[in-house]
Amino acid sequence: MTAPPLVRSPEVAEATAAGRAIVALESTIITHGMPYPQNLETARRVEAEVRAAGAVPATIAVMDGAIHVGLDDARLEDLARTPDAMKLSRADMAACLAAGRTGATTVAATMICAHLAGIETFATGGIGGVHRGAETSFDISADLQELARTPVTVVAAGAKAILDLPKTLEVLETFGVPVIAFGQNDFPAFWSRASGLQAPLRMDTAAEVARAHRMRGALGLSGGQLVANPIPAEAEIPREAIVPVIEAALADATAAGIAAKAVTPYLLDRIFRLTGGRSLEANIALVLNNARLAAAIANSLVTGH
């Protein structure tokens, strides 16, 4: 069997050899989530947050026919300036690698690459999930199935609030994915701390999350964990303020005939415009918050405390 084309940055290679805590970071937030140069600045800030919390960041992307686990600053800038990067999930990652194209990793693809690199913790903004109207469109993110099969603990501010959150939780339950609200009972809704939906599980410390991750491995259970970490209170957009904006953006997407992988980037851009940029500020705050928690979990996995 051919070994996967995986290249670790010097920082990640050194951390791997030394058994240090490493946090995987996705790259679609860079290529599809924000405009340049804000995307580059945010990526640097997220990496700095992981380092400040005592772990090593490993931003993951496909470039030059290889999976890069950890990007130096030049590669990070190249990616941030790439207008036509593929948005990669399980289905198209091999094709992107084989063609030598540039691709940014979604939650699903980042989990696959992190697992190949021996990284057990991953921080993102929000996972994908069941889209509204999925009962007719069947539009369900591959992120959910990946959580059921790849043993990586994913820290996110819940699922993106543009999705059908009750159905997303139902599918995660069907797939046997532990959904853990961190520090509260309510499942967070990305820009808002509360969705009005009770999370199946609650944990209050990084050590608890790390112990549960280890126990899943000991039991031979496939899949990872979703740690739903609420956005900091000072940065949130309350549910009553964001729901009408989401509804308006969804109506615009329907009228414009937006479908498939184009839906999420379109909606996020529309909501950015409708909130006067406030949604992007909240997005940055929640990603930084998730990076801090993921670093704490990664450290607990390494130290056993």
PLM feature spans:
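N- or domain-start disorder-to-order transition segments that initiate the globular core
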Residues: 1-19
